[in-house]
Amino acid sequence: MHFKSIIFYSLLATPMLASANSITESQERMVIEQQAIAYTVSGDWAKLDAMIQEYNTGFPTTSGGTHKLVLAWGGIYGLYAGDVSGKSIDDVATQWLKARPNSTGARMLQAMVFDVKAVGLRGEGAASSVDPDVWPKYKKLMVEEKEFLLKNKDIADKDATWYQEMEMVARNLDDKELLYSTLQEGSKKFPTYQNIYLQAMEGRLPKWGGSAEEVEKIARMAAENNKNQSGLSYYSYIWFNAISFQPEFMTLLNKHEVISWDNMRQGWEDRYQQYPSTRTLNNILATACIARDKDVFLKADKMIQGQTEPDVWPQGVEYRTCQASFR
């Protein structure tokens, strides 16, 4: 993951490269999600299976670097997540499996039924707001999902989502050993799939009993596994998402503690080489502002030509405020 720094600065001569990609990330995400939803609603299971297989082959990404696989599954899951009883998503999984008995996608969706029911029980508020009587039922559902995933582990040979789902289960069961063993196995089998690292990172955030040092460990692991083709890109990407999930980490970046700004800066240069989009430039601007790196911020600011995306910036970090602070 160590491309030369000159790559980033030479791109200043071609700002329209970023401009051309200014709206494609959001459009691409919507197209993928809507296509997955359309196949699901119409019951076109063969095309849905083909879509999932395609997105598991080489893990293609959007122009901004988001893996299409997670978007497809997000569209399907989101379609039924509002039904807290889990009946809607369960019915769909049953129909899918009946039509295509060998579908790994149908069984993957069956696993997600447990998650929908668990979220319906627990809600999405702080743990302190949950009725104590709910926890045994919640844990039971997570144990059942774990058992289902283990029974259907052959899915993991064809769909990397299995590992991501098991990491989520491990987080919800507060099973650190399961989370790390799943991460180790999954990253060995599918080293380039970002969301295996992202889900593990989320599960080891301080709010889930983890620490900044554990996030650093996972970010380093992701970077090491992908250094030959991606430089330090994964390091920056994992930490940016960690900061978005847990804004308190901004203090570490600002003070240059635990998080290496030198490595993050290099990682963004590497990522821009792969994904020269305004999404990447927004990531650079936000983190450069937090780290108080005026040089990097101003160079990226020239390239982005005002095409900022406020919704992807960490909580409390605002483009105009950052821009004014470096004048």
Predicted regions mapped to residue ranges:
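N-terminal mature-domain "stem" immediately C-terminal to a signal peptide or N-terminal signal-anchor/transmembrane
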Residues: N21-S63
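Short coil/linker segments at helix-helix boundaries
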Residues: A46-N102, L109-K227, S233-R265, K299, ...
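Amphipathic alpha-helical protein-interaction segments enriched in hydrophobic
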Residues: Q229-N241, P276-T287
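Extended alpha-helical scaffolding segments
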Residues: D270-W313
